[in-house]
Amino acid sequence: AATRAAQAALDAAHRAHQNVSVAVVDRDGRTLVTLRGDGAGPQSYESAVKKAYTAVSWNAPTSALVKRLDSAPTLKDIPGTLFLAGGAPVTAKGAPVAAVGVAGAPSGDQDETFAKAGVAALGR
């Protein structure tokens, strides 16, 4: 399932002509799968892992978590996290069970669209 989610996210980015890296983590934030698209920047791999870790830790898309920094700016100091759009949780009965992180597109919003495509692939 993790590989299917990662490939779906990478495929969505490819269709949009974006070179990204994708990571899928489990409930405990352990990396299950990483895929790096041709031409993805060297920073994108680590960023994708951190976005997925952040999304599963808070059970929320990382775009929503960015807004929390206004009231709790020290959240960004938690090791392993990255508060930029591009991470999307996978839930079962409302609880986080995994997350998909994507990095490398020109905007975090694009990254997150691709991450959500990965999550959606799990429902197929």
Describe the function of each predicted region.
Residues 1-124:
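Flexible, solvent-exposed loop/hinge segments and secondary-structure transition points
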